[in-house]
Amino acid sequence: TGDYSQVYKQSLAFVLGIFMIIGILLIDYNFLGKYYKAMYIISLVLLAIILIPGIGAERGGARSWLNLGPLDFQTSELVKLTFILSYAKIVESRKDKLNTIKDIIPVVIYAIPFLGLLFAQPDLGTAIVFACIIAGMLFTAGLDINLIKRVIMVVLVSLPIIYMFMAPHQKGRIEAFLNPEDPTLKGNYQVMQSMIAIGSGGTTGKGLYNGSQSQEDFLPVQESDFIFAVIGEELGSVGMAFVIGLYALFLTRMLYIARQAKDFYGT
């Protein structure tokens, strides 16, 4: 489309990501674990600072972005890493005491401030991601399966109450999810355009920069949340299968590394 601003931002983010990967490879995770309390506090500060007017930027109904000049930074993305590093240490200290509600309450209390700050933004999507991270870590730590079932039941029963406190745009997204074929719902426009893009790509796609949905801006937020639809339109099912394969390889490698960890914290 002639707009290279996203190319610049994505390239800058890519370079920063490479430096972070190199840094992580050079630092022993046990060294980071020694500073889990500091990381815990820093994580909360990063989520809280964007709630201050004039510092945090609002997008899509949520104040979750920090403007750093040429690069907009979503603090929750960094917090995902620092939270895992700090929370893993907390879970490790109680890994043999996760069999009853009484045992799990102290561990959950550590996570509540994070979920509270995310709801305050309000960023329901990221809050759900954090909830899944917490659940996954507790499950890995040996949380009793019957206790997991009870927690799921409590969450399901609480859904109507949670819905009452949701922001209007969040309710709109849920309504769109429950009624995906209703074109009158604003939240369905992007999903429908992405389905058109993927469907029109066929097996091999229309070719790079030849997608009508993406190049003519029918598909919003195509550079981030809906990049997969662009891949489907321009590279077809072959391109999508390749991307899914990369994710599968990445996940397999992650699980292998976790199983090879020398201690519970590394897992």
Please identify what each model-predicted range represents.
Residues 2-190, 229-267:
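Hydrophobic alpha-helical transmembrane segments of multi-pass inner membrane proteins, especially
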Residues 190-209:
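Extracytosolic (periplasmic/ER-lumenal) interhelical loops and adjacent juxtamembrane/interface segments
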Residues 203-235, 258-261, 265:
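Long extracytoplasmic/lumenal interhelical loops at the membrane interface
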